[in-house]
Each structure stands twice: as structure tokens, then as C-alpha cells.
């Protein structure tokens, strides 16, 4: 695979307004910066417990750092012991005894480091978990408190992903890294103070090293933090766009939008990549400057020390050696400043982004306690001279000086064209917005003076597009009890009220038939229920609290005629004694209203009762005539004597209690179900994961080569240092000019070593960021692309909610960025240093080298690998748990209108927090286990240094090795220990990166069932007709024991217009899903033009099909963008190409499609016309407007097969009439085959064949006239909808 991120140009401003899906609101407040202040503020979210844990941890870290400094004292004694033996002061036996005693101090020091390292790492990590939990809690609370207008700007689309991914960045920068930093600083300060007391002049020279290092690090980190902030902002916009794509995945599949949408998603990533490239020279400068300064300072200290010794200012060589060794140990700890500063700046940038929303004051805060809460509600509603424009379109007046009185206890109906302001009134009554001018009163009180939560609890709403939440049916209806006296009642009492409400909404019967009844889980957004079932549950949710004011915004639009009749009666009954405002396009549902208000362009055209308006013969009467259905006996005159059409056969309905598939079929269904389960996937180990990442982008081979060469050069640092320090000891055996000359030479060698570090680390820092940014870009794009490749059943799985998927899109590529950035280079350098130091030790003293290398390094590596394995398992578990919390946040934010109308912000926040608490509490034990392994990696180095010191001195005393060889070997062991200790400090980044790689690799190889293959590549759908279904049975893959279709036989001829009608949940929309190949039949077959559908190339097939869904899906971008996505271009390029067929669609084609969908007038009236942003999910448009745009998108495709799933359900009567004529014309256009699902029977009465579904089968078939005469189910449906 090749990435073209490098070659893509950023779209111009003009292009971005027409083709780039943009977030309409700025994501960053003016002047906002990620600074040290933002980092400090992270810790203000720590409670008393967290502060105590952190204080104890920092004390332990400082003690651990002081323990590091104690090494120097032991080494000072070590030099004394060596000197005494060399000078003959002590005997070989005394020498061995003294060495053994000193070796024990190393053992004790290692034990202390084990305890202290375990303590501070465990406490800091746990405290960070809790602090991040508090920040996430505050962030979602702030998000849920924002007024709806905030989300209209598209500002909240990626809130769930930000909470998860930014939380992980904060976690990384506010946990164990703090302990390591304090440990390093404590070591440096302790060493400096101890040496300052003894040799203050030389020590003061050495202090220039940290001053220069810290100064350089601070400046570079500050600049780098600004770039990190900008990248996070761009990624937040990209996540928002991706969230919209994944939420509308069925539309993406149906229209083959994947490559076009991924290409638009990539435009954000290209911009982020450009900013990311600017970090490369900064990291090169940061790492190279750090190591160069350290070795230059080291050389200066050695040079000055030699000359001070020559002048007699320093008494013994041991004093110089001790100071130099202090510099070395302190410098090793200072080298951690650079990588940690990057972690801290990323945490600050991530926190600053979250704090911006946390600090934002909502104009309408649902958490506020202020406002009136009257004890009694009558229900008098009055709108007085209300004028309103949406904040996103202030130039368009939606309501113009509008006045209306809604008497208490009466039913008032609002009708009119889409966009006339009907739903706007609902939004104002719910206080989603405040009017521009005028007043709205409830029982004489201005609603702006009422408590927001109290108002929404007493004014209940059923929306046009009902939104349900993950959980059970009971959970969803119970949300309506929040804030009422029954909220804390027993489950039995709540269940009683829930069932009463369900019966009222005609939902009890179908709920009782579900697998687990009221405890049945319904999936994300209620996806496992049909549209009509969802709407009935939503009605039950709104009436369960017995509100005094009820708002019904197309509350029965998704119900079948029979259910609609019964539910309407129930609503009529529910309306008794309460104020009800009904918005309806189905006029049959409002004919009994006390007052019907006909609206147009924000004004009232006429109002009155059904009878008075009919008598007036005005606008309303004309609408009634359009919707009227003929059900009289004269229809019999047009019926064939046989009672059947030429291709129509009446099927006998036979009910079967449970469908039992053969064992082989059930086995296949279960294998398909398990195939999408990531937990069953075999995971790659670290080396395999790294190899996969390297192979994935071969275009980075030169960058990898630079990193390899840089690492090879960098690994020479410790061996070179060991040799030079050993030579330093020899220098002190000389005197006079010879000593000074040798001293000057070795000081210059240290400068050469510094120059080598400058070159190597500059290359490593620059190249690793280049690789990391490229891989992050590539995998963000690839993971979205691979998700969109999957079958619909992949998105049906509980773990694959939209929020969880977006979280993975954001967090997994970032984990790879951390793994393949400087972290992996430091790990490689540390590994090479351990190897080279080990080889050096063996080369100079093979006995000592073999004993120490094979006695110390294997247990250290073993402990580190065990930590990585445990850490990896912990990361997978926490990611899964945070995925659940992310799903809760995502569905709440995306359904903010439903959440606010139910006033369940606190309930949602409590659910979210409970998931966070569960994630934190379940992480304690595995975290404690992994920290034991970390403690071992920090202490084992002391134990094999003790072994090396004891055994080396023994060899020296026995004359088996020279003093110089011993020094080289021992210092090599010492530096190998230092390198190995650093090796596993990055294990958290390693494990996260490995887990991310495993998921991405699994997803990439996961092949959908419905896909193009070499076998079907050339197999097209032919003419697209006839379509034949032979004994089709179907169960959803995740519910194999709940059959939906139970043996459907049907033939649809070329040019026919066929309609599916029936009760909600009877299988109509499932038939549409089968014809779109969202799913394949469990048994039976579907043939297209005599070819089995499963044998046809799905891309070729879908290219001749267009779908209009019941709940239209629009994407971020302009109206033009959304319609253009419907165009099929046979030359569409793969997603990594620069070419985009969508941009080639002409404005004339767009206009033609809009006119056909009766949408041109309203679109052309907008200030930006077809270039008007649709908003996230089409939020800038009304429901009817969204549906017309979706119809235009389907018609511009010029399909051979047109699938209409309640295509006109959200349209007003006039628009429906015009659009219906357009759709009928489209259906009659040539040989086009049209399949329509409809509850509004007036839209399908002219169909060639009407199929009445019942119980998963076709109960009746025929024309409108034939079925009316037959007097069966269809006739009863028509009678229910007749208006005359």
C-alpha cells in the first residue's frame, strides 16, 4: 500500500467551502495555548485522596533518586579500596572482603529501588487514572450542559473521541513519568549538593550542564506544544467527520461513498501531517542538543579537573573521578528530560482542548438550579410576537412576529410545508433556543424565567426521528421517569408504570414477544428495532411520566396504519386533560384537534377545526384532498374477475412459532457471528508487530535507514564512555606535562563523542518523527477505510458502536505514533547499548563479562517482557471498558436534543461515570502486577553490578585480569545496567502501540462477506430485472434464533412499481436491506436477471441501485457535496488517489435532481444556495428538507432499481404530492424497477403490486383496487387513513 499524504495539496479556501466537510464552528478560542498552566491545571482535578497518593509517590520517587546518588558514594569507597590494594596497603584477602562488603550495599540499594519504584509508579498511575476520570466526567458534564445551538455549529461531533483519546494523552503525561522525572531531578540535586560540599569549584562547572539542558528543553517543548495543540484541533474536526460517516454507514454502503468520504477525511489528515512535519526539526534539535550539552560539559569538567589536580587544587585523583562519575550518573537521568517533556506537552495540549469546553458557560444550562418551579401546571401556552432565526443562519427568519395561544387541556395541531417553522416552535418550547424577540409563556410565566430542567420534565416531546439509547427496552422507557417521584421507586413499581405506558403506545404486545421482553437489549440507537417499534417506545417514554404538556413532532410518522390508528386513539386519550401540540403531515392524525394551525414561511395562514377549515375550502382543504384514499365499493369495477394480477399470487399465511435452521446453517451463522469478534484473533508479539508496521509503508525505507544508522551511532555512546573513563584512571598515574597532555587528549575525545551524539541524535529525532507522523496519517485513513469495508453486521455488534469506533480511529494511530516515534529509537539504542556493553565487557575480561551478562541481563529482560505482556493485557481491557463509556458519551452527544428534552443529563452522566469507575477499579490489580515487573527492571541492574563488582575484584586479586581490563569491563556492565533500566521505561507506549497494531492488522485482513472477489469481478447484474425471491428466510446474524423473514416468495418484473406494507417489525425494511445486500438470506435465494444475487459483484450491483432511507443520512459538508455523493462514476479512484469523481458533478445536474425532489425552491432561497453547509448529520436542515436532499441524492444516480424505505414520511403534504409525482415518474422511467415501503398508503396506491406483510410472510398481494375489494388487511389499513 502506498500513501500519497506527501503529495496531496491542501485544498484552497474556495475548494474547502464546496468540497471539504468542515466543522462550521472554530474549535479553539482566540488566544488559547497549551502551556505549563494547562498542565498544572490537570492536578486541580485531584481530590484529597489523589493528592495524598501523589505526595507519597513523589517522596518515594525523590528517595529513589537519592538512592541513585548513593551509587556515587559506593563508587567512591570502591576507588579507595582499589587504590589501597594497588598501593599494597591491603592484602588480596582484605581486598576481597572489602569488595564483598561494598557489593552488599549494591544489593541493599537494589532492594530499596524495587520498593520505592513500585510505590511511586503504582500510586502515581492510580492517581492519574482517578484524575483523568474526573476530567472526563467534567468534560461530558460540560458537553451535556451546552445549548443546542452549540451543536448546530458542529462543535460537539467528536466529544466522545476527545474524552477518550485526550484522556489517554493526559494519563500518559500525568502518571509514572512524573515519578521518573522527580527521581531524576532528585538524583541530580543530591549528587550536585554532595559534590558541591566537597569540591565546589569543579561542581559549579558541572552545574552548567543542567542549566543549558533544561533551558533548551523548555524552549523547544514550548514550541512543540503549540504544534501538538494544532494537530489535536485538526484531528478533532476529522473525528467529528468520521463520526458522521460511521453513524450513516448504511448510506455509505448503499451509494458506494466509501472512497469519496475517506478522501475527504484524508484532507484533514493531510493538514495535520503538514503541522506534524514541523515537529521533526524540533525533536532533532531537542535530542541532539541534550546529549551534546551533556558530553561537552563532561569534557569541560574532565579538562578542568585535570588542570586543577596539576595545580594542586584537588588533592587526590579519586576526588576527580568521583565528581566525574557524579556528572555521568546525573547526566544519564537528565537525558530523560527530552522524551518526558514531549509527553508533558502533549498532555498539556490535550488538557487545554478539554478545558476549553469545561470553561464554556452555556447560555441555557440544564444543570442550573435557578428559575421558578411552580407547584402546579395548567398547560396554557402562549407565543407572543415571536421572531426567530437559527444562530447558524441569522439572515433567514424562520418565525416572523409569530403569535399563537394554545389553551390548557386542548389539542393544537401545526401543519404546513417543511421549513415553515413548525418544529422550530417545538425547539423554542423546549428551550433549545431562545427567541430573537418576543415572549413565550407557560401559565403566564415566561419560560426563560422557569427552571430549565423543571420545564423539560413537564413538557414532554416525541420527535420525528425517535432516538433510543443502548440498553434494554425497560431502560429506555424508564428514562421518562427521571426527575419524577417514580425515579427512585422499586423496579416493580417502575415496571408497572412502564408497561402501562407501553400499552398506551401500542408497544406492549411486540415488546412481550421479544427474546427477553422488556429486558431485551436493543442496540445502538435502538438499531435492533424497526422504525415503527422505535417510535412506539419513544411515545411510551414520553407519556410514562404523565406530563401536563405533550409535544408530538410527527409522532406517528413511522407507524403502520393499523398501529397508527390504535396509537392515535391512545394519544387522543392521553391528550385528555393535558395540553397537546401536534405537528403532523398525515392529516388523518390531527382531524380531531381542537385547533389546526396552517403555517407558511413563519406565519399563520389559517386556523380552525377540521370541519371549519374544510368548509373554508382553503389551503388545508386542498391538503386533505391530496391525501384522501378511495375505499368505496366502486373500486370493485376496476378489479379483474380473477381477483389477481398476471404475476400476482395470494399466499396463505401460516404461522410457525420458531424457525429451526439445519445444523449446517446454524453452524455457518455462528461462524459468521464469531468472525467479527476481535477477542478471537491471535495477537502478534512485539517483533511481529514492529515488522508489520515497517512492511506496511515501504516508502519510508530511507527514513528507517537513517534511524538505524543513527541508533548504531548512538549506541556507541556508553561503550565509548566506558573506555574513556577507564583511560581517565590511567591518566592519574602520570605526572606533570604528560598527565596534562593525556588529559587534554581525552577531554577532546569527549568533545568528539559530543559531536557524534549531535549528528546521530539529530538524525534520529528528525527521522523518527517523520516516520511517526507518516504512519499516524496512514493508519488513521486506513482504519476508517477498513471499517467502512465491513459488512453491516460488523456495526451491529455491541462493541462496535459509533463512539467506540471513532475512539479507535483516534487513539490507535496515536499509539502507533508514540511507538514508532522517538520511543522506539530510544528502545533500540538501549538494546544496542546493552549488547555492545556486554560484548565490550566480555572482550576485556571474558570471565567477568560472561558471568555478569548472562547472570544479570536475562532476568532483567525477562521481567521487562513479562511487564509488556501484562501491560498489553491491561491496555486491551481498559480500552474495551473505555470503549463502553465512549459509546455512552457518543450517543448522548449525537442525541443531545433527546437527552435535553428528557432532562436526563445527570442520568447519562451517572452511567458514563459508573463505566469510568468500573474501568479504573478493574485496572488496579493488573496495574499492581505490572508495576512489580517495572520495579524489578529498576533494581536488577544494581544486583548484577554487585555481582560484577564482587567477582571482578576477586579476579583482580587473583591476578586473572588487569586493573584496566577490570575497569573497562565493570564500567561496561555499569552502563549496560543504566541502558537496561531505561529500556523498559517506555513499556506503556510499547504495549499500547502493539495492541493498536494488532487491531489494525486484524481489521485490515478481516474480509466482509459481501465483497468483490476475483470470481465475481466480471459478473454484473445485467438489466437489473426481474428480481425473484425463492423461499427467502432470514435472521439477523447477532440474533439467529429470532427469524424475521419466514419464507418469502416474490417476483418483480422490469419496470414494475411494487410496494411493501404491513405492521411495524413484519419484515418490510428487512426486505429492503436484502435487496441492498446489507445482508444475505439465511436460506433461500434472490436472483437478479436469472443470476443469483450472492454471485454478482456487489459493487456493480449497488451501482444500479439507489436507496432513500426512512431516517435520511446526510454528512458534514455542503448540500452540493451530499447530493454529489449519489453519483456513480465508473472511473472512481481508490481512496488513496487524488482524483475525486464527486467534484466532476455539474451544478446543472445538482439543480435537476433538486427540482425532481421538490427541493430547489428552498435550496435556492438560502444565501449560499447549494453551497450551504448541511451541518453534522444534516442538523442545519429540517427533517423534511433532509429527506428531500436524500431523495435528490438517489435520483441523481439514475438507478435501474429504486428502493424507497418510507421515502416521503417526513414531507409535508404539498411536497409529498410533488415528490411523489417525481418518484412515480422515476418509477415509470424506462425499465426502472421501484420497491417502496410505506405506511402512508396514499403514496403507493398506484403501485403495480402491493404486498401486505404479516409475520415475516406475504399475506396479500394485488393492486390497490383488488386488495380493497378483497376486504382484508389492506382495506382495513386504508379505512384507518381515510379522511373523508
UniProtKB/Swiss-Prot annotation:
Annotated region Disordered: where?
Answer: 1-24
Q: Which Pfam families match?
A: ABC_membrane (PF00664), ABC_tran (PF00005)
Inducing factors? Expression is strongly increased in the presence of cycloheximide, imazalil, itraconazole, hygromycin, and 4-nitroquinoline oxide (4-NQO).
Tell me the InterPro entries matching this sequence: AAA+_ATPase, ABC1_TM_dom, ABC1_TM_sf, ABC_transporter-like_ATP-bd, ABC_transporter-like_CS, P-loop_NTPase, Type_1_exporter
Q: What is its main location?
A: membrane
The ABC transporter domain sits at: 381-626, 1027-1280
Q: Where in the cell is it found?
A: Cell membrane
Q: List each copy of the ABC transmembrane type-1 domain by range.
A: 55-346, 705-992
* UniProt key word Cytoplasm: no
- Basic and acidic residues bias: start-end ranges: 1-11
Question: How does the record classify its membrane topology?
Answer: Multi-pass membrane protein
Quote the record's binding site residues for ATP. Answer: 416-423, 1062-1069
Write out the function statement from the record.
Pleiotropic ABC efflux transporter involved in the protection of the cells against a wide range of toxic compounds.
Q: What protein family is recorded?
A: Belongs to the ABC transporter superfamily. ABCB family. Multidrug resistance exporter (TC 3.A.1.201) subfamily.
Q: What is the official name of this protein in its record?
A: ABC multidrug transporter atrC
Amino acid at each position: 500500500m502506498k500513501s500519497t499524504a506527501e503529495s496531496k495539496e491542501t485544498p484552497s479556501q474556495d475548494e474547502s467551502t464546496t468540497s471539504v466537510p468542515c466543522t462550521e464552528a472554530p474549535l479553539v478560542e482566540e488566544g488559547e495555548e497549551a502551556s505549563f498552566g494547562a498542565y498544572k491545571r490537570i492536578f486541580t482535578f485531584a481530590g484529597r485522596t489523589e493528592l495524598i497518593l501523589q505526595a507519597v509517590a513523589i517522596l518515594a520517587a525523590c528517595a529513589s533518586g537519592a538512592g541513585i546518588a548513593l551509587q556515587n558514594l559506593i563508587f567512591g569507597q570502591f576507588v579507595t579500596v582499589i587504590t589501597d590494594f594497588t598501593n599494597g596497603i591491603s592484602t588480596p584477602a582484605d581486598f576481597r572482603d572489602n569488595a564483598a562488603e561494598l557489593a552488599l550495599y549494591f544489593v541493599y540499594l537494589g532492594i530499596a529501588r524495587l520498593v520505592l519504584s513500585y510505590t511511586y509508579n503504582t500510586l502515581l498511575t492510580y492517581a492519574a487514572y482517578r484524575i483523568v476520570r474526573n476530567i472526563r466526567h467534567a468534560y461530558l458534564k460540560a458537553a451535556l450542559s451546552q445549548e443546542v445551538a452549540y451543536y448546530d455549529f458542529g462543535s460537539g461531533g467528536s466529544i466522545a473521541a476527545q474524552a477518550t483519546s485526550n484522556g489517554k494523552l493526559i494519563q500518559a503525561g500525568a502518571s509514572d513519568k512524573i515519578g521518573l522525572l522527580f527521581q531524576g531531578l532528585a538524583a541530580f540535586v543530591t549528587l550536585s549538593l554532595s559534590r558541591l560540599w566537597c569540591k565546589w569549584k569543579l561542581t559549579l562547572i558541572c552545574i552548567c550542564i543542567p542549566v543549558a539542558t533544561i533551558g533548551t528543553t523548555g524552549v523547544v517543548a514550548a514550541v512543540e506544544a503549540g504544534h501538538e495543540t494544532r494537530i489535536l484541533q485538526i484531528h478533532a474536526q476529522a473525528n467529528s467527520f468520521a463520526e458522521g460517516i460511521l453513524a450513516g454507514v448504511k448510506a455509505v454502503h448503499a451509494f458506494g461513498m466509501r472512497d469519496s468520504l475517506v478522501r475527504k477525511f484524508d484532507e484533514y489528515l493531510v493538514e495535520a501531517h503538514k503541522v506534524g512535519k514541523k515537529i521533526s526539526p524540533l525533536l532533532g534539535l531537542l535530542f541532539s542538543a541534550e546529549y551534546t550539552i551533556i558530553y561537552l560539559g563532561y569534557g569541560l569538567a574532565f579538562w578542568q579537573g585535570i588542570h586543577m589536580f596539576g595545580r594542586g587544587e584537588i588533592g587526590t585523583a579519586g576526588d576527580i573521578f568521583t565528581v566525574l562519575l557524579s556528572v555521568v550518573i546525573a547526566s544519564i537521568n537528565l537525558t530523560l528530560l527530552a522524551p518526558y517533556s514531549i509527553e508533558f506537552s502533549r498532555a498539556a495540549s490535550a488538557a487545554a482542548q478539554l478545558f476549553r469546553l469545561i470553561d464554556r458557560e452555556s447560555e441555557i444550562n440544564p444543570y442550573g438550579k435557578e428559575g421558578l418551579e411552580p407547584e402546579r401546571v395548567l398547560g396554557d401556552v402562549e407565543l407572543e410576537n415571536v421572531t426567530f432565526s437559527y444562530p447558524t443562519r441569522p439572515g433567514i427568519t424562520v418565525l416572523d412576529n409569530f403569535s399563537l395561544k394554545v389553551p390548557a387541556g386542548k389539542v393544537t395541531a401545526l401543519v404546513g410545508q417543511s421549513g415553515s417553522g413548525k418544529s422550530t416552535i417545538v425547539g423554542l418550547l423546549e428551550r433549545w433556543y431562545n427567541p430573537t424577540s418576543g415572549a413565550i409563556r407557560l401559565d403566564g410565566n415566561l419560560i426563560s424565567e422557569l427552571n430549565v430542567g423543571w420545564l423539560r420534565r413537564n413538557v414532554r416531546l416525541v420527535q420525528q426521528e425517535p432516538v433510543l439509547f443502548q440498553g434494554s427496552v425497560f431502560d429506555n422507557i424508564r428514562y421518562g421517569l427521571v426527575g419524577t417521584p417514580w425515579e427512585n421507586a422499586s423496579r416493580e413499581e417502575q415496571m408497572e408504570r412502564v408497561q402501562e405506558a407501553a400499552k398506551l403506545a401500542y408497544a406492549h404486545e411486540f415488546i412481550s414477544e421479544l427474546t427477553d421482553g422488556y429486558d431485551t437489549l436493543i442496540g445502538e440507537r435502538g438499531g435492533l428495532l424497526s422504525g415503527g417499534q422505535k417510535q412506539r417506545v419513544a411515545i411510551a417514554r414520553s407519556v410514562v411520566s404523565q406530563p401536563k404538556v405533550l409535544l408530538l413532532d410527527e409522532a406517528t410518522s413511522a407507524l403502520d396504519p393499523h398501529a397508527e390508528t390504535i396509537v392515535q386513539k391512545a394519544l387522543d386519550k392521553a391528550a385528555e386533560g393535558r395540553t397537546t401540540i401536534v405537528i403532523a403531515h398525515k392529516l388523518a392524525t390531527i382531524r380531531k384537534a381542537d385547533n389546526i394551525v396552517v403555517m407558511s414561511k413563519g406565519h399563520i395562514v389559517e386556523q380552525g377545526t377540521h370541519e371549519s377549515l374544510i368548509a373554508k375550502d382553503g389551503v388545508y382543504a386542498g391538503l386533505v384532498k391530496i391525501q384522501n384514499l378511495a375505499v368505496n365499493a366502486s373500486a370493485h369495477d376496476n378489479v379483474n374477475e380473477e381477483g389477481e394480477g398476471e404475476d400476482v399470487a395470494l399466499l396463505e399465511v401460516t404461522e410457525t412459532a420458531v424457525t429451526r435452521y439445519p445444523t449446517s446453517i446454524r453452524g455457518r451463522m455462528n461462524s459468521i457471528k464469531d468472525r467479527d469478534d476481535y477477542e478471537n484473533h491471535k495477537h502478534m508479539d512485539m517483533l511481529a508487530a514492529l515488522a508489520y508496521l515497517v512492511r506496511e509503508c515501504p516508502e519510508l525505507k530511507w527514513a528507517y535507514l537513517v534511524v538505524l544508522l543513527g541508533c548504531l551511532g548512538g549506541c556507541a555512546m556508553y561503550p565509548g564512555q566506558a573506555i574513556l573513563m577507564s583511560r581517565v584512571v590511567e591518566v592519574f598515574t602520570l605526572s606533570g606535562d604528560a598527565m596534562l597532555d593525556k588529559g587534554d587528549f581525552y577531554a577532546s575525545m569527549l568533545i568528539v563523542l559530543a559531536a557524534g551524539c549531535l549528528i546521530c541524535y539529530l538524525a534520529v529525532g528528525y527521522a523518527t518523527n517523520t516516520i511517526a507522523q507518516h504512519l499516524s496519517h496512514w493508519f488513521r485513513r486506513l482504519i476508517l477505510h477498513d471499517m467502512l469495508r465491513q459488512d453491516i453486521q460488523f456495526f451491529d455488534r455491541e462493541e462496535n458502536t459509533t463512539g467506540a469506533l471513532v475512539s479507535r480511529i483516534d487513539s490507535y494511530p496515536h499509539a502507533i505514533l508514540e511507538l514508532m516515534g522517538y520511543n522506539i529509537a530510544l528502545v533500540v539504542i538501549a538494546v544496542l547499548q546493552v549488547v555492545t556493553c556486554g560484548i565490550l565487557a566480555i572482550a576485556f575480561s571474558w570471565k567477568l563479562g560472561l558471568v555478569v551478562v548472562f547472570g544479570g541481563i536475562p532476568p532483567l529482560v525477562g521481567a521487562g517482557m513479562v511487564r509488556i505482556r501484562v501491560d498489553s493485557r491491561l491496555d486491551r481491557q481498559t480500552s474495551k471498558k473505555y470503549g463502553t463509556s465512549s459509546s455512552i458519551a457518543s450517543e448522548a452527544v449525537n442525541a443531545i436534543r433527546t437527552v435535553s428534552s428528557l432532562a436526563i443529563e445527570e442520568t447519562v452522566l451517572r452511567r458514563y461515570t459508573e463505566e469510568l469507575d468500573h474501568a479504573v477499579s478493574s485496572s488496579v490489580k493488573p496495574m499492581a502486577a505490572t508495576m512489580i515487573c517495572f520495579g524489578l527492571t529498576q533494581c536488577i541492574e544494581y544486583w548484577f553490578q554487585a555481582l560484577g563488582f564482587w567477582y571482578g575484584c576477586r579476579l583482580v586479586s587473583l591476578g586473572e585480569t588487569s586493573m584496566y581490563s577490570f575497569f573497562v569491563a565493570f564500567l561496561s556492565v555499569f552502563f549496560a545496567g543504566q541502558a537496561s533500566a531505561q529500556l523498559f521505561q517506555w513499556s506503556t507506549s510499547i504495549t499500547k502501540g502493539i495492541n493498536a497494531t494488532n487491531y489494525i492488522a486484524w481489521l485490515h485482513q478481516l474480509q466482509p462477506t459481501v465483497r468483490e472477489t476475483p470470481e465475481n469481478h466480471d459478473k454484473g447484474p445485467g438489466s437489473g430485472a426481474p428480481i425473484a425471491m425463492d423461499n427467502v428466510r432470514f435472521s439477523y446474524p447477532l440474533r439467529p434464533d429470532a427469524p424475521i423473514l419466514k419464507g418469502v416468495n416474490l417476483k418483480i418484473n422490469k419496470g414494475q412499481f411494487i410496494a411493501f406494507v404491513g405492521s411495524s417489525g413484519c419484515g418490510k425494511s428487512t426486505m429492503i436491506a436484502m435487496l441492498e445486500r446489507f445482508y444475505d438470506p439465511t436460506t433461500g435465494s434472490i436472483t437478479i436477471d436469472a443470476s443469483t444475487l450472492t454471485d454478482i459483484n456487489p459493487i456493480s450491483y449497488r451501482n444500479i441501485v439507489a436507496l432513500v432511507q426512512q431516517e435520511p443520512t446526510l454528512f458534514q459538508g455542503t448540500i452540493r457535496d451530499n447530493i454529489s455523493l449519489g453519483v456513480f462514476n465508473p472511473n472512481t479512484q481508490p481512496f488513496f488517489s487524488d482524483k475525486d469523481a464527486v467534484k466532476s458533478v455539474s451544478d446543472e445536474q445538482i439543480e435537476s435532481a433538486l427540482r425532481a425532489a421538490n427541493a430547489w425552491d428552498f435550496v435556492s432561497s438560502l444565501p449560499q444556495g447549494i453551497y450551504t453547509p448541511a451541518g453534522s448529520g444534516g442538523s442545519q436542515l429540517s427533517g423534511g428538507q433532509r429527506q428531500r436532499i436524500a431523495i435528490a441524492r438517489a435520483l441523481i444516480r439514475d438507478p435501474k432499481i429504486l428502493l424507497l424505505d418510507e421515502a416521503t414520511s417526513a414531507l409535508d403534504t404539498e411536497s409529498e404530492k410533488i415528490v411523489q409525482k417525481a418518484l412515480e415518474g422515476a418509477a415509470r422511467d424506462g425499465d426502472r424497477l421501484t420497491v417502496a415501503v410505506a405506511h402512508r398508503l396514499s403514496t403507493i396506491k398506484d403501485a403495480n403490486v402491493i404486498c401486505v406483510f404479516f409475520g415475516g410472510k406475504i399475506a396479500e398481494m394485488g393492486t390497490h383496487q383488488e386488495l380493497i375489494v378483497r376486504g382484508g388487511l389492506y382495506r382495513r389499513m386504508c379505512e384507518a387513513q381515510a379522511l373523508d
